[in-house]
Amino acid sequence: MKLLTFCSFKGGAGKTTALMGLCAALASDGRRVALFDADENRPLTRWKENALRSNTWDSFCEVYAAEEMSLLEAAYEDAELQGFDYALADTHGGSSELNNTIIASSNLLLIPTMLTPLDIDEALSTYRYVIELLLSENLAIPTAVLRQRVPVGRLTTSQRAMSDMLASLPVVQSPMHERDAFAAMKERGMLHLTLLNMRTDPSMRLLERNLRIAMEELVTISKLVGEALER
């Protein structure tokens, strides 16, 4: 089982949204995915509840409460016993012993960020913290920045400047663009199943097209993540 962790010191950086998107892409490819909800607000638990009501939860996936060390250990042990292919961990903001344990146990670390001065500053702080932690533990874990809510059209001058600041860091080549499909995942459930349900309704043809484009974007990101895990 490969553990992928989404981490950021800043709340609202897009950790949970990125995790939901990658989960949908992996599940659509037939992968079994365990989700470790290490945020005390349990956003992944609420996501599953919403998805079950909408018939958009994939049975290949399961959410585990993991906001305490004992819960995390139990979640990891059970997920391995159940034979999940991947575990995706949603950390809480800031540094803690729990976050450090998750980071140090990961196979890949993703740091989501939007292209604003505040977000980039927090992403750089998170990246420095992660690298220092890995060095102190004598670990070499691939770490990359995932750009979030990137405009579909041209970037503003400020956004280009923020993107340039990331040039010296490992960055996932394909970003998650700013799309309603991504923003609505928390309420609608898993994107690939939402898309499947809409394909049967002719009145939803335009929305179905938008969801399909978003899903294709997630599949591209999941392939890049898979390549990073194989290096």
Swiss-Prot record:
Cite the entry's keywords alphabetically: Crown gall tumor, Plasmid
Report the SUPFAM superfamilies cross-referenced here. Answer: P-loop containing nucleoside triphosphate hydrolases
The UniProt entry, under Pfam families, shows: VirC1
Question: Which InterPro entries would you find in this protein's record?
Answer: DNA_Partitioning_ATPase (IPR050678), P-loop_NTPase (IPR027417), VirC1 (IPR009744)
The reply to whether Isomerase figures as a keyword in the UniProt entry is: no
- Domain of life according to the entry: Bacteria
NCBIfam families tied to this protein:
PRK13849.1
The name this protein carries in UniProt is Protein virC1
